[in-house]
Structures are given as structure tokens and as C-alpha cells.
Swiss-Prot record:
Task performed by this protein: The TFIID basal transcription factor complex plays a major role in the initiation of RNA polymerase II (Pol II)-dependent transcription. TFIID recognizes and binds promoters with or without a TATA box via its subunit TBP, a TATA-box-binding protein, and promotes assembly of the pre-initiation complex (PIC). The TFIID complex consists of TBP and TBP-associated factors (TAFs), including TAF1, TAF2, TAF3, TAF4, TAF5, TAF6, TAF7, TAF8, TAF9, TAF10, TAF11, TAF12 and TAF13. TAF7 forms a promoter DNA binding subcomplex of TFIID, together with TAF1 and TAF2.
Assigned protein family: Belongs to the TAF7 family.
Name this polypeptide is given: Transcription initiation factor TFIID subunit 7
Swiss-Prot/TrEMBL GO biological process terms: regulation of transcription by RNA polymerase II; RNA polymerase II preinitiation complex assembly; spermine transport
Amino acid composition bias (Low complexity), ranges on this chain: 105-116, 328-341
The entry's keywords: Coiled coil, Nucleus, Phosphoprotein, Transcription, Transcription regulation, Ubl conjugation
Organism field: Cricetulus griseus (Chinese hamster)
Length: 341
């Protein structure tokens, strides 16, 4: 469906809530429901130039009014047949009328302060006077403080100040004789620290490393003694003995290397099992604590159905505790068998 340029624009409604004292509210309600033609003569609203104060007249009785801001926006709906509703406007303000209010409040003359920050603070305090902390129903009393989060403050820096700071930094860099920069990678430092740490236990690894070094020293001493004593023998015997000694030395070195590799593999396996044991102990302790809390809860509950439900949960925790104990005992047995080897 095409629109022509001659179509008149849609009229937008501007609405607010009118709150009156109970006796005047009932009068206005009856007049609206009866559909009197002279409603405009019975109810008039006059706003002052400041846009926040005004006078509401009900049957020519003046009431002081103040326009306040509601905590949130509400929708206004209209119906003709009480079956289909149409949205007409968004409402965010309410005109509160009182009998004992000041009909003509004093007008504050604007004074230009020297400090702009002081003027902003003054305007903010002035706006707070017209903020309504409650909703339109009784359960929503003080809803602005109970349900709404405070607005986050955004600190803006004016662009001229930023440009001035950038120019100052660039000028100081240009005046510098020399510059020095350094890049530190946290991941690399952590890797180097981890590589520097000894993974195996200090007692076992120190004992095995000392044992291996003693074997290497003994082999070197044997080789040196035999090589020095063989100088007095004949050349043929010297060559044969040297070859035999080299073979023996190589065999022993290979055996020591294999043993060292086996020891390292055993150490890693032991550490892995020990870690699993520690984790299993933590899980077992957590399960036991949960079971203890469940037992205390069952003792306090009097409802039979609820107690049966809690008892079922406790039985599951007990079964889980038994399974974790079995896993822990099997891990400990495996660790003991490795240490005996």
C-alpha cells in the first residue's frame, strides 16, 4: 500500500497520570464515567512556565500540582469493546495534586556560577526533587531503590585535553636522548620456571642419581687403572685387553642408562598415582561432608515425605562414598607395589 505525500501525519498522544486526593478523585471519576459534556468546565489543568508545577481545578477548587518522573515507562492502552486493546502512548510522568500545597511556588532565578562543575551539580540536585521513588500501586513503594540498579557513571574526557596530552607525550619522546623498551612474555617465564623444577621426589631421585654417578666413577677408575697397567705388557695383548675393556665399559654404560630411564619412568608413574590419590582423598572428604550435612538436615525435618526424599539423597551419597573408598584403596595398593619394586 503506497502512501501519498498529501497524507496528514499521525497525531501522537502525550499522556501523564493525574493523581488527586481521594475525595476529588471520586468526583472526577464519576464525571468521566457519566460522560458529561461540561467536563472541561469541571476539570482544568494549568502548568506554570517551569513545566514542573501547576494548578489543578476540580469544580473550581484549586489544588497544587507537581509533575514528577516515574521510575520507568508504562504503556497506556485504549479499548472500545473491552475485548480489543490499542496502545496509545508511553507514560513516564505523573501529576501529583495536593490540597495543602503551594499554588504559586517561588521561581528560582538562574544564576550563572563561575565553576561549570558547580552548575552541573546544582542542575542534578534540582532534577532529584522531581524524581518519584514509588510506583503507582502500593506493593511498589520505594521501588526505585529496591528494584532498580543505580545508573553507572560514565567519565568522558574532552577531546582537546586528550590531544594536548598526546602532543606532550610526543614532545617528551622527541627530546629523549635514547629510548629503551622490553617485552616480557608471561607464558615463557612460566615455562622456564616449570622446567627448572624437579618433577620427581627429592629423596628417591637424589639416591638414584648418586648411585648412577658412583657406577660411572667406578667404571672410569677401572678403565684408567687397566689402561695404565697395560703399558708394560706386549702390544698384541694391550690391543686385545683395550678392546675387551671398551666392550665391557660400553655394556655397563648401556645398562646404567636403561636403568636410569626405567627409574625416571617409574618416578613419573609414582607421581601420577600420588596425584590421583590426593584428588580422590579430596573428593572423598567432600562426599563425607555432604553426607554429614544431609544427616543433620534429616534430623531437623519433620515432614515425612521430605524426610524420605532427603534419605534417598543420603543413600546415594553413602554409595558414592563406598565407591570412592574402593578406588582410593586400589590406588594405594598400586602405589605400594611400585615402591616395593
Amino acid at each position: 500500500m503506497s502512501k501519498s505525500k498529501d497524507d496528514a501525519p499521525h497525531e501522537l498522544e502525550s499522556q501523564f497520570i493525574l493523581r488527586l486526593p481521594p475525595e476529588y478523585a471520586s468526583t472526577v471519576r464519576r464525571a468521566v464515567q457519566s460522560g458529561h459534556v461540561n467536563l472541561k468546565d469541571r476539570l482544568t489543568i494549568e502548568l506554570h512556565p517551569d513545566g514542573r508545577h501547576g494548578i489543578v481545578r476540580v469544580d473550581r477548587v484549586p489544588l497544587a500540582a507537581k509533575l514528577v518522573d516515574l521510575p520507568c515507562v508504562m504503556e497506556s492502552l485504549k479499548t472500545i469493546d473491552k475485548k480489543t486493546f490499542y496502545k496509545t502512548a508511553d507514560i513516564c510522568q505523573m501529576l501529583v495534586s495536593t490540597v495543602d500545597g503551594d499554588l504559586y511556588p517561588p521561581v528560582e532565578e538562574p544564576v550563572a556560577p563561575a565553576d561549570p562543575k558547580a552548575s552541573k551539580k546544582k542542575d542534578k540536585d534540582k532534577e532529584k526533587k522531581f524524581v518519584w521513588n514509588h510506583g503507582i500501586t502500593l506493593p511498589l513503594k520505594n521501588v526505585r531503590k529496591r528494584r532498580f540498579r543505580k545508573t553507572a557513571k560514565k567519565k568522558y574526557i574532552e577531546s582537546p585535553d586528550v590531544e594536548k596530552e598526546v602532543k606532550r607525550l610526543l614532545s617528551t619522546d622527541a627530546e629523549a636522548v635514547s629510548t629503551r623498551w622490553e617485552i616480557i612474555a608471561e607464558d615463557e617465564t612460566k615455562e622456564t620456571e616449570n622446567q627448572g623444577l624437579d618433577i620427581s621426589s627429592p629423596g628417591m631421585s637424589g639416591h638414584r642419581q648418586g648411585h648412577d654417578s658412583l657406577e660411572h666413577d667406578e667404571l672410569r677408575e677401572i678403565f684408567n687403572d687397566l689402561s695404565s697397567s697395560s703399558e708394560d705388557e706386549e702390544d698384541v695383548n694391550v690391543i686385545d685387553t683395550e678392546e675387551d675393556l671398551e666392550r665391557q665399559l660400553q655394556d655397563k654404560l648401556n645398562e646404567s642408562d636403561e636403568q636410569h630411564q626405567e627409574n625416571e619412568g617409574t618416578n613419573q608413574l609414582v607421581m601420577g598415582i600420588q596425584k590421583q590419590i590426593d584428588n580422590m582423598k579430596g573428593k572423598l572428604q567432600e562426599t563425607q561432608d555432604r553426607a554429614k550435612r544431609q544427616e543433620d538436615l534429616i534430623m531437623k525435618v519433620e515432614n515425612l515425605a521430605l524426610k524420605n526424599r532427603f534419605q534417598a539423597v543420603l543413600d546415594e551419597l553413602k554409595q558414592k562414598e563406598d565407591r570412592e573408598k574402593e578406588q582410593l584403596s586400589s590406588l594405594q595398593e598400586g602405589l605400594e607395589s611400585l615402591l616395593e619394586k
